[in-house]
Regions:
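Exported/periplasmic ABC-transporter solute-binding proteins
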Residues: 5, 23-65, 72-77, 81-84, ...
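Bacterial N-terminal signal peptides
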Residues: 10-22
Length: 314
């Protein structure tokens, strides 16, 4: 009888191969240990919403102790890149996917599902020592086009100082928003530059009297959050309007009414082909508790009815 030799390394290699295939999770097959409130996943989030999603994630994981979500906060371009390359299955952006992006995913057997979760606004912030608190949307457009370069051109009584515009990141949704809104296809003028985050924008404006910063309003709108309150105390919000008589700050009521000119929506997008943890987290943020967190943050909930109250001064 012929004896067959046993190689003890073969079973180990088979197990390793199974683990590798499972980690790749081809065609979005549901892992055995994942459910809407259980599992371990990574998601990518637009850096503009770090304060908001730190709270959302803390609350969600406190309720569902078997859920572990590792969030990466990045500029919009990098968030989308993670999603399209299947590095993450769930993302947060300030725009929906394009037709071409959806078709690409569909060609790879993925259907992207978009949920609008909030209405946001881009705030223009200035140094507390700057007296120019009002600006028209077209004046800001002319600043980004290089037609206005000095604060005196905004207000003749202002100090004769150059305007230094600071964005959060060259790859951010904030930059894209204003390029699209004002149809700017070329480079911004040399007095416009980018740092690395919304927080760095706030710190730059705090230390530079002639600076004009652009951030998501949720960084300075939650007065019950110590970080947001500290930021708000270090800068001033500009009032923005379409004409000299009608202008407002990016407060919730004006965002809800779209009276404030620079409003946008916030989306959660999932490519899960099963009811996994990403789907569960999207449902939580779009549900009652998640929407209340959004309301508290200073943004406007997208799926929760809100009531606007007018307060008159007699």
């Amino acid at each position: 009888m012929k004896l067959i030799s046993f190689n003890p390394f073969i079973p180990a290699l088979i197990i390793i191969a199974i683990i590798v295939v499972s980690c790749r999770n081809p065609m979005g097959v549901q892992p055995l240990d994942e459910a809407p409130t259980r599992g371990n996943i990574r998601i990518s989030i637009d850096e503009s919403y770090q304060l908001l999603y730190d709270t959302q994630l803390y609350t969600f994981e406190s309720l569902y102790v078997n859920a572990k979500i590792a969030a990466s906060y990045k500029p919009e371009v990098e968030v989308l890149d993670d999603f399209m390359k299947d590095s993450v299955r769930t993302i947060v952006l300030t725009r929906d996917l394009t037709k071409e992006e959806r078709e690409y995913l569909l060609a790879n057997s993925f259907v992207a599902r978009t949920t609008k979760i909030a209405h946001d606004a881009l705030a223009l912030i200035i140094n507390p020592g700057n007296p120019d608190t009002i600006i028209r949307d077209q004046q800001f457009a002319d600043i980004l086009r290089g037609k206005i370069t000095n604060w005196k051109e905004i207000n003749p009584t202002s100090s004769d100082k150059p305007i230094n515009v600071v964005f959060d990141n060259n790859k951010s949704g904030n930059v894209r928003y204003f390029r699209e809104r004002f149809n700017i296809t070329g480079n911004f003028p040399t007095n416009c530059f980018a740092v690395n985050s919304n927080e760095e924008v706030i710190n730059y404006v705090k230390n530079n009297p002639s600076a004009l910063g652009i951030i998501s309003v949720n960084w300075v709108s939650d007065k019950q959050d110590s970080i947001s309150e500290r930021f708000l105390e270090s800068v001033r919000l500009m009032e923005v309007g379409t004409d000299p008589k009608n202008h407002c700050k990016p407060y919730q009521g004006y965002i809800a009414e779209r009276s404030y000119p620079f409003c946008r929506d916030v989306y959660m997008i999932s490519r899960e082909t099963f009811s996994g943890l990403g789907t569960g987290f999207v449902s939580f943020v779009a549900g009652d508790q998640g929407q209340r967190i959004i309301l508290k943050s200073g943004l406007v909930p997208a799926t929760m009815p809100i009531r606007l109250i007018e307060i008159r001064k007699d």
